[in-house]
């Protein structure tokens, strides 16, 4: 039986909504959702910037460690990416500091498992590998951009960063991904309200010569700033989506479908 035109339009509308939703895990839970988290409307950027407020680490864009050996905002060469094994998997060794509790370790490793099954990325406990991520609890949530070489720290502060969405965000930085709103084509999708931004923090909104991997701008990306990042005052948005200013940005739960697609494209996952 043929579907009525109105029914077809409804199905297309629902499909469009579904494409913007965060990814769900195999148990049917929303990836990155924190059980019992009462502050459900705080976006990832706000949590990260709040946690990083007192850090003495030199950071770019709020949570990227400023490197000394390359252009911070350029991670296109193969030396910046983690190597793929002959079996097609990108194995990234890690160690987790003993200062974390068992529950905190479970949260960190649960965020790492969000990459399994949907990408070729595999975070594995380090044995004796030279390149590895060291997860530590310093003052703030931050990461290197891409593979640094040797030991590289990824800070997940026990007090302010212990959320799966934040951990996935920082792991994406470690894979080589930048913030969504710094894309070279961002001016077609968001308006930066410079007058509402703390002057000393305005550099965090500079555009970069990014490799967009032939993917569309993603308002729902876990790598997108919230609308009031680095704002001078409550209610003074620093970022406004265009043409529809009501489009949600700065979600807090987990990787979007385009986040996952980009990992698969960048690392040539099969």
Swiss-Prot record:
Location(s) in or outside the cell: Zymogen granule
Record EC number: 3.4.24.67
CC cofactor note: Binds 1 zinc ion per subunit.
Maturation-removed propeptide residues: 21-70
Keyword Hydrolase in annotation: yes
Superkingdom of the source species: Eukaryota
Residues at the active site: 170
SUPFAM superfamilies with a match to the protein in the record: Metalloproteases ('zincins'), catalytic domain (SSF55486)
The protein's required cofactors: Zn(2+)
Keywords from the named record: Cytoplasmic vesicle, Disulfide bond, Glycoprotein, Hydrolase, Metal-binding, Metalloprotease, Protease, Signal, Zinc, Zymogen
Further remarks about this protein from its record: In medaka the hatching enzyme system is composed of two distinct proteases, the high choriolytic enzyme (HCE), of which there are two isoforms, and the low choriolytic enzyme (LCE).
Function: Participates in the breakdown of the egg envelope, which is derived from the egg extracellular matrix, at the time of hatching. Thus allowing the newly hatched fish to swim free. HCE binds tightly to the egg envelope while it exerts the choriolytic swelling action.
Protein known as: High choriolytic enzyme 1
Gene name, Swiss-Prot/TrEMBL: hcea
């Amino acid at each position: 039986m043929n579907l009525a035109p109105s029914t077809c339009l409804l199905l297309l509308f629902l499909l469009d909504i579904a494409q913007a939703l965060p990814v769900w895990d195999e148990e049917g839970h929303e990836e990155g959702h924190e059980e019992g988290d009462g502050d459900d409307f705080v976006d990832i950027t706000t949590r990260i910037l709040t946690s990083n407020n007192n850090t003495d680490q030199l950071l770019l864009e709020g949570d990227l460690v400023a490197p000394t050996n390359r252009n911070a905002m350029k991670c296109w060469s193969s030396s910046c990416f983690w190597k793929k094994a002959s079996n097609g998997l990108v194995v990234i060794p890690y160690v987790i500091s003993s200062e974390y509790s068992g529950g905190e370790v479970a949260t960190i490793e649960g965020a790492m498992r969000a990459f399994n099954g949907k990408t070729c990325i595999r975070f594995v406990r380090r044995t004796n590998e030279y390149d590895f991520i060291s997860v530590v609890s310093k003052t703030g949530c931050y990461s290197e951009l891409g593979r640094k070489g040797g030991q590289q720290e990824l800070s997940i502060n026990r007090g302010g960063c212990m959320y799966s969405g934040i951990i996935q965000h920082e792991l994406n930085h470690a894979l080589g991904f930048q913030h969504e709103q710094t894309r070279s084509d961002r001016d077609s999708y968001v308006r930066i309200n410079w007058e509402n931004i703390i002057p000393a923090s305005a550099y965090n909104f500079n555009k970069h010569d990014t490799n967009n991997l032939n993917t569309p701008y993603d308002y729902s990306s876990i790598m997108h700033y919230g609308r009031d990042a680095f704002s001078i005052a409550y209610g003074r948005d620093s970022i406004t989506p265009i043409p529809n200013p009501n489009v949600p940005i700065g979600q807090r739960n987990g990787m979007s479908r385009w986040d996952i697609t980009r990992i698969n494209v960048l690392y040539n996952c099969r």
